[in-house]
Amino acid sequence: MKKYIILLILSGFIITSSFAQEEEPSSDPVYAPFESGILIDQQTGVIPDARTLEFIIQHKFGSMDNGRSDLWGIYSPGANVRLALNYVPINNLQIGAGITKKNMYSDVNAKWTVFEQTDDNSMPVAVTLYGVAAIDGRNESAFGTGKVVETKGEALPASVSFSDRLSYFSQLLIGRKFTDWFSLQAGASFTHYNMVGWDYNHDVVGAHAGGRIKFSPQSSIIFNYDQPVKIESISEQTDWDTFAKANFSVGLEIATYTHAFQIYAGSANGILPQDMMMY
């Protein structure tokens, strides 16, 4: 009888230990901190699996200022669209290229998730670096060159070189999935345009925040906020008349296994991040 009791106790200990081991959090990356690599106007730390090719469509209607006469922006002028392809050559590294209607931008971009948040909190946040270089493809006559020939601020009518058309955006993002239904991220960015109008700054520093509140397995409320920061020490202007306004957007995300659809309203017409930070 004692043998059986000892065996039962040992068996119970082994079973209990195995269950305890299974319940311990692993050092694996957390599952789906966001449903997509894009959160309205921002990036996230999400990058698809290696050797994934991703097609992106981003579309914005015009201003809602005229209300129902323009069907709240659907018929109003100023619509913007971007088509892009992203490819993931290795895990946690994504490269891409796209074209945008506004300013006829062509862009190349890269995103690297340096650290992923883990289940056991050995890495409590995800850290991501993102960068974009874009070319303004408009005709020379569309440019305000910013090349001042008189103190009145008159600019040369043309003389736009290839390098004048270039703009850059770099960003650091830190995000965390707090629960299965709530994720939040914050970031800082630097924007540079090689050439701008005489009344603009070439450089803009930005602060960013965004998040997701999930209310069903496929649906979430999403939001983002982008704030150009006024820094007098790097400003080339004496006032802030042309300084970009903050961008706030809120919307609904519906996700499937392979797609994420986002419907939202926001205050920025631009799609490329440097365009939103500058204009």
Located regions from the model:
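A mid-sequence, solvent-exposed acidic-amphipathic segment
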Residues: 186-230
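Compositionally biased regions
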Residues: 12, 18-19, 142-143, 184, ...
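Cleavable N-terminal export/targeting peptides
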Residues: 1-31
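Transmembrane beta-barrel domains of Gram-negative outer membranes and organellar outer membranes
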Residues: 21-160, 166-170, 178, 182, ...
